[in-house]
């Protein structure tokens, strides 16, 4: 197993443990399907640099050691039940770039996004998740996002492509056509 795969597995395992221990007032569909959770999260992490993966794996290990549950914190932030966890200005910058990428995809693939990918509260969800990251991980992820933007890439599209590829589709367009056929029939 290569280092990226090992780090991704370590992260997904830690996150899934945290998801299983989210208090009852924060039910999530991901808790209902371990396979779906692992698919979505691993697909996202495949787009991260090895440095960002290593940093976030360290965050997960340190958080678990300290008794933190990033998933509980994230959902509490989404519902504005706790004050901001991290106020780094990088969070706003990352969210702005990611929202722009999402909007471009949403207009290009309306059926895919109607299925729940990148819902209307995407910015709140992302901001709440980013607040659980260490400053070290935020800096590394910001470098990943900035590099992708400079190269004209869309990391959101790359994440979705990896996810639907794991489901057996060749492209987002291929999946969008499948959804159009289902809706027409």
Spans of model-derived segments:
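Short, flexible domain-boundary/linker segments around small modular repeats
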Residues: 1-47, 78-130, 165, 169-185
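Repeat-associated, polar segments at repeat-unit boundaries in modular proteins
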Residues: 54-90, 145-179
């Amino acid at each position: 197993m290569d280092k990226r795969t090992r780090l991704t597995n370590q992260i997904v395992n830690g996150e899934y443990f945290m998801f299983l221990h989210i208090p009852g007032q924060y039910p999530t569909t991901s808790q209902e399907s371990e396979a779906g959770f692992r698919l979505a999260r691993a697909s996202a992490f495949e787009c991260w640099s090895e440095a960002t993966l290593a940093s976030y794996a360290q965050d997960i290990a340190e958080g678990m050691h300290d008794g933190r549950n990033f998933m509980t914190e994230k959902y509490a932030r989404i519902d504005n039940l706790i004050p901001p966890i991290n106020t780094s200005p990088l969070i706003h910058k990352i969210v702005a770039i990611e929202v722009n990428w999402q909007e471009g995809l949403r207009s290009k693939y309306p059926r895919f996004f109607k299925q729940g990918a990148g819902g209307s509260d995407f910015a709140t969800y992302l901001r709440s998740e980013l607040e659980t990251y260490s400053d070290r991980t935020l800096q590394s992820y910001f470098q990943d996002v900035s590099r992708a933007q400079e190269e004209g890439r869309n990391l959101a599209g790359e994440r979705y492509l990896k996810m639907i590829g794991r489901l057996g589709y060749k492209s987002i367009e291929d999946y969008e056509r499948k959804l159009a056929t289902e809706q027409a029939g």
